[in-house]
Every structure is written in C-alpha cells, then in structure tokens.
Amino acid sequence: MSTITKDQILEGVAALSVMEIVELISAMEEKFGVSAAAVAAGPAAAVEAAEEQTEFDVVLASFGENKVAVIKAVRGATGLGLKEAKDLVESAPAVLKEGVNKDEAETLKKSLEEAGASVEIK
C-alpha cells in the first residue's frame, strides 16, 4: 500500500467541485462520527451573559402620527423647553436620556409610546 501525502490530498480536494466537497465532508462526518459545525465558545460566553446591564439609553426612534403629544411627553420627561423638545423630537432617531435605570427607562418608554412615539431602550 502506498502512502498518500498531505499535499496530494490537498491537490485532490482543490480539483473537486463545491458539490463534491460537500459530499466529501458528509462522508467524513459519517465515517469518523464527527460534525463539521462550528463549536460555540463555552465559559467566556457564560460570563458575559451573567453581567446584567444596569444603565440604559432611551432612544426616540420616531414620533409617529401625533407629534404634538410626543413633544409634550418629551418635555415632561426631560424638562426641556418647548423649542428644545420640538427640535429633539424632529431630529429622531435621538437619545432622550442616557444612563438611566431599567425602571425609569421602561416608564419613559411607556409614556412616550402612549403619546404615539416609537421608542427603543438600548
């Protein structure tokens, strides 16, 4: 029996079509009982998931149909003057508040959505 080198194998694979390579991979998975699927990162991903976000940014995505009501809601939530609130609403998407806790972000989102705005929490 003659020995086949790695270079000969690589040359043989390079000559195959994509469909033939897919069939080769399937046959190798079957023969060796393995999977060619990517292995997901284990412990590092678990550590990142354990850290819960504590500060959120409330972003006005759009003011929807009722711009006046949204401007009033923005004024009430941010303490801005009428002109500043109007400019902020018209420049959507815009950050309304940064670094707020989850409860405050959810409350602000709810009040703005009731006024007709589209809001995101990031």
UniProtKB/Swiss-Prot annotation:
Keywords: Ribonucleoprotein, Ribosomal protein. One of its GO terms (cellular component) is cytosolic large ribosomal subunit. Gene3D superfamilies: 3.30.1390.10, Single helix bin (1.20.5.710). GO terms for biological process: translation. One of its GO terms (molecular function) is structural constituent of ribosome. InterPro entries: Ribosomal_bL12, Ribosomal_bL12_C, Ribosomal_bL12_C/ClpS-like, Ribosomal_bL12_oligo, Ribosomal_bL12_oligo_N_sf. CDD domains: Ribosomal_L7_L12. Belongs to the bacterial ribosomal protein bL12 family. Forms part of the ribosomal stalk which helps the ribosome interact with GTP-bound translation factors. Is thus essential for accurate translation. Homodimer. Part of the ribosomal stalk of the 50S ribosomal subunit. Forms a multimeric L10(L12)X complex, where L10 forms an elongated spine to which 2 to 4 L12 dimers bind in a sequential fashion. Binds GTP-bound translation factors. This is Large ribosomal subunit protein bL12. It comes from Yersinia pestis.
